[in-house]
From Swiss-Prot:
The chain crosses the membrane at residues 30-50, 58-78, 102-122, 126-146, 254-274. Its EC number is 1.14.15.3. It is found in: Cell inner membrane. Catalyzes the hydroxylation of n-alkanes in the presence of a NADH-rubredoxin reductase and rubredoxin. It preferably hydroxylases long-chain-length alkanes with at least 12 carbon atoms. It catalyses: octane + 2 reduced [rubredoxin] + O2 + 2 H(+) = 2 oxidized [rubredoxin] + octan-1-ol + H2O. GO terms for cellular component: plasma membrane. Fe cation 2 binds at H185, H324, H327, H328. It holds the Pfam family FA_desaturase. Pathway: Hydrocarbon metabolism; alkane degradation. Its cofactor is Fe(3+). Belongs to the fatty acid desaturase type 1 family. AlkB subfamily. This is Alkane 1-monooxygenase. Induction: Induced by AlkR and n-alkanes only in stationary phase. Repressed by oxidized alkane derivatives.
Length: 408
């Protein structure tokens, strides 16, 4: 008689573990959507290359079409998920390497898409307008790549920091790796934070304030870090210089390989990518403010200091960035373990649906100012208000400035 066949014990344990994690996180395999974004980009580029001339420009603008139209529509149809993992499940999710591999897999695919785009842009038959449109499409991917860099920037491992810089290289926004974890997380939802928008501040006023303010902050942070180690800013250990060097090497290589004709494309994708990321920054803390304690320091960051949303599709694309309150409460907590808080202020829709309204100030103010007003129970003295429009905003809600009444 043949000996009974036994299933390999190790293999069975792996299968059981995978089944267990699938039960904990029912979206486990749907998270592949985020690293699949560059693959969608590659498909858009292939469509541009091989499509008939009359529809080439539709493919050239494929990135914004997906980002601003298709994703918001699907997001609205699919709806929300406010479920939370338990404390025990959070530990299991945090220790599962599957999720970290997903985040990192975005980066090589991002570079394949970028190189493919540069090849298309370098062809003589690619018009200047198409170079700009392709730059916008790739800017959408490289802008969302900043979110990949964001997830990696909070890790303690040096390799993760390098990978974070690699995701930022196409946009040249490498100072984000320094400023976000050590600057923004310290000052979030305060008037001093260049990355927190103020009530009544348009995105076009916020953009220069956050871009240049965050750059200045990153330089100050890295200068102080090096000084504590007895080193100067112009040191090989300066992480800012390392990141900028990586970006310079990438762009120089692209120009050397594909020619100067790629410059309009490179500038466009960087500008659009940076702007896309900063629109999300604009949304995240709009008008919200941490209050000062009796000792003059700000209260700790709480769930009520970030705008949140549970729309499933946008969360799948952005590693649950919309569960922003838990991210600020636990900055090193990986995306798969982030929780929803009932007390956190809620956006009217997902980030993807809010991008276009954020670029139209009257529409944005109509959608959001009332929410800030209601969040603070009609006490706008607690809100983070844009100084230039403070009196106008208070008057809009039938309020007066107590500082003016008191002669301050």
């Amino acid at each position: 008689m043949n000996a009974p066949v036994h299933v390999d014990q190790n293999f069975e344990e792996v299968i059981n573990a995978a089944r267990s994690m699938r039960e904990i996180d029912r979206k486990r395999y749907l998270w592949m959507i985020s690293p699949a974004l560059p693959v969608i980009g590659i498909g858009i580029l292939a469509g541009y290359q091989f499509s008939p001339r009359p529809i080439k420009k539709i493919f050239a603008l494929g990135g914004p079409i997906v980002l601003h139209i298709i994703i918001p529509v699907i997001d609205t149809i699919i709806g929300k998920d406010a479920s939370n993992p338990t404390s025990e499940e959070i530990k299991q999710l945090e220790n599962d390497p599957y999720y970290a591999r997903l985040v990192k897999s975005f980066i090589p695919l991002q570079y394949i898409a970028n190189v493919y785009a540069c090849y298309l842009v370098s062809r003589k038959k690619t018009s200047f307008i198409d170079k700009i449109l392709l730059g916008i499409s790739m800017g959408a991917i490289n802008g969302i790549a900043v979110n990949t860099a964001h997830e990696l920037s909070h890790k303690a491992d040096r390799l993760d920091h390098i990978l974070s810089h690699l995701a930022l290289v196409p946009t040249g926004y490498n100072h984000f790796r320094i400023e976000h974890p050590y600057g923004h997380h310290k000052r979030a939802a305060t008037p001093e934070d260049p990355a927190s928008s103020q009530m009544g501040e348009t995105f076009y006023e916020f953009w220069p304030r956050t871009v240049f303010g965050s750059l200045k902050s990153a330089i100050e942070i890295e200068t102080h870090r090096l000084k504590r180690k007895g080193k100067k800013f112009w040191s090989k250990d300066n992480e800012l210089l390392q990141g900028w060097g990586m970006s310079a090497a990438f762009h120089s290589s692209i120009i050397a390989i594909f020619g100067k004709g790629t410059i309009p494309y490179l500038v466009t994708q960087a500008f659009y990518g940076i702007s896309l990321f900063e629109i999300i920054n604009y949304i995240e803390h709009y008008g919200l403010k941490r209050q000062k304690r009796a000792d003059g320091n700000y209260e700790r960051t709480m769930p009520e200091h970030s705008w949140n949303n549970n729309n499933i599709v946008t969360n799948l694309f952005l590693y649950q960035l919309q569960r922003h309150s838990d991210h600020h409460a636990y900055p090193t907590r990986p995306f798969q373990a982030l929780r929803h808080f009932d007390e956190a202020p809620e956006l009217p829709s997902g980030y993807a649906s809010m991008l276009l309204p954020a670029m139209i100030p009257p529409l944005w103010f109509k959608m959001m100012d009332k929410r800030v007003f209601e969040h603070y129970k009609e006490d706008l003295t607690k809100a983070n208000i844009y100084p230039k429009r403070r009196a106008k905003i208070l008057a809009k809600f039938g309020l007066t400035d107590p500082n003016i009444e008191n002669g301050k």
